[in-house]
């Protein structure tokens, strides 16, 4: 037949497997160049795109103003934001950010997120950034939908848990223009801490 290959000779049938094993044996004793990932973790690049983080102002107020631009920019539709109004009303008013609004509900679905960073570019207040944390695997799908409490940056010394009034300026413009100094740490039981 015109299309069938010629049968291999006994010599070719003998040497072909030995040549293949020769490649295996030659590389078996060379130095390993792969990273042994679960056991040896190497640092990521400084601008690595990992898990998201919602940032805070130096007094502890949230930078997110609930504008939903990050959700609109997301090509994977992985971000859900619900905004609400801040209030300085003495009768039960709460302030979570210096702006008129804040992100009451903030969710990122890491089952859908492609870690592209378009949400970071869209954020007008630099409230959303990406950390170097990349181990997001989980055995439960529900745990991969991160809520606002999972995404908020931790409180540093001198910060106060919102809701509380603006401490760094008289209006939101002072926050956005950077016309403030870092707040002094409050002593336990002080009037500013008790009033919050």
Curated annotation (Swiss-Prot):
Enzymatic reactions: a quinone + NADH + 5 H(+)(in) = a quinol + NAD(+) + 4 H(+)(out)
SUPFAM superfamilies from the UniProt entry: 4Fe-4S ferredoxins (SSF54862)
Annotated GO biological process: aerobic respiration
Residues bound to [4Fe-4S] cluster 1: 64, 67, 70, 123
Its membrane topology: Peripheral membrane protein
Keyword Ribosomal protein on entry: no
Free-text cofactor note: Binds 2 [4Fe-4S] clusters per subunit.
Cofactor(s) essential for the protein: [4Fe-4S] cluster
Pfam families hit by this protein: Fer4_7
Ligand binding ([4Fe-4S] cluster 2): 74, 113, 116, 119
Chief localisation class: membrane
Enzyme's top EC category: translocase
InterPro entries (alphabetical): 4Fe4S_Fe-S-bd, 4Fe4S_Fe_S_CS, NADH_quinone_OxRdtase_chainI
Role, per record: NDH-1 shuttles electrons from NADH, via FMN and iron-sulfur (Fe-S) centers, to quinones in the respiratory chain. The immediate electron acceptor for the enzyme in this species is believed to be ubiquinone. Couples the redox reaction to proton translocation (for every two electrons transferred, four hydrogen ions are translocated across the cytoplasmic membrane), and thus conserves the redox energy in a proton gradient.
Annotated protein name in UniProt: NADH-quinone oxidoreductase subunit I
Organism name: Nocardioides sp. (strain ATCC BAA-499 / JS614)
